[in-house]
């Protein structure tokens, strides 16, 4: 993977981001490069350190 793909999300950004569906806080999965919304059961991708907070771009979490 290139360095741009492995960039982490800014911790300050994580403090203010919420799930657009549930408005709940998100958990960052560093290995998968995703922001996890437990309430919505969605994983939002992080590309080049930028969270893609569109429900249509999110992956449905497995139960």
UniProtKB/Swiss-Prot annotation:
One cellular component term from this protein's GO annotations in UniProt: cytosol
Top-level lineage group: Bacteria
Pfam families: Trm112p
UniProt-listed HAMAP family: UPF0434
Family: Belongs to the UPF0434 family.
Protein name: UPF0434 protein Mmar10_2939
